């Protein structure tokens, strides 16, 4: 049975830093945060049962910080429509990654119309026209409710990454938060 997540991404105010500005605690976690390949495909190799849980997909405004990262001017923010898609990637019925994607409405109507609970990564990484920009990273200490939900001790750090993908004249952003049971936090000796 899949665990339901009651927290919204990104769990409060988050400061994103350009790659190289944060000290990542170990090489194993760094390999997950900075891997430019398909996260979906990598997660699928670490479990027997992989699922995408669609939390929501709706037309809404992105945050001001997301618009800045997407390179969208204030004038364009009012004119363009965006879809915000939030999913949880589960491995063997454990929530591993919470992902938030900001996708131009026009792209949803063309290429992503029937995405539903399918992984976005299957589209992005099977089309050479998608070009990934450099990562930004974040590290936070979640609130007490989050720690309690996962049975975690205080001072537990949660890591995430985000990057912009350029596709033709469009830019879309994917942010991924590695949840506590994600393989990114496991010692590499325990990886499949």
UniProtKB/Swiss-Prot annotation:
Q: Which residues form a coiled coil?
A: none
Q: Which reaction does it catalyse?
A: chorismate = 4-hydroxybenzoate + pyruvate
Renumbered to this chain, the signal peptide range is none
Q: Which Pfam families match?
A: Chor_lyase
Please name the GO terms of the biological process aspect recorded for this protein, alphabetically.
Answer: pyruvate biosynthetic process; ubiquinone biosynthetic process
Entry annotated with the keyword Lyase: yes
Biological role stated in the UniProt entry: Removes the pyruvyl group from chorismate, with concomitant aromatization of the ring, to provide 4-hydroxybenzoate (4HB) for the ubiquinone pathway.
What is the protein name given in its UniProt record? Probable chorismate pyruvate-lyase
């Amino acid at each position: 049975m899949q665990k339901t997540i009651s927290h919204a991404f990104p769990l409060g105010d988050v400061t994103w830093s350009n790659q190289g500005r944060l000290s990542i605690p170990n090489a194993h976690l760094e390999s997950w945060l900075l891997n430019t390949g398909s996260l979906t495909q990598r997660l699928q190799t670490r479990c027997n049962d992989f699922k995408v849980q669609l939390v929501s997909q709706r037309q809404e405004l992105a945050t001001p910080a997301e618009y800045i990262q997407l390179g969208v001017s204030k004038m364009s923010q009012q004119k363009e429509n965006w879809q915000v898609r939030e999913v949880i990637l589960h491995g063997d019925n454990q929530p591993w990654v919470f992902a938030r994607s900001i996708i131009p409405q026009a792209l949803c109507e063309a290429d992503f119309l029937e995405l539903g609970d399918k992984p976005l990564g299957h589209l992005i990484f099977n089309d050479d026209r998608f070009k990934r920009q450099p990562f930004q990273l974040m590290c936070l200490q979640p609130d007490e409710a989050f720690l309690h939900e996962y049975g975690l001790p205080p001072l537990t750090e949660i890591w995430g990454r985000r990057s912009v993908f350029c596709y033709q004249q469009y830019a879309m952003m994917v942010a991924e938060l590695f949840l506590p049971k994600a393989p990114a936090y496991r010692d590499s000796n325990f990886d499949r």
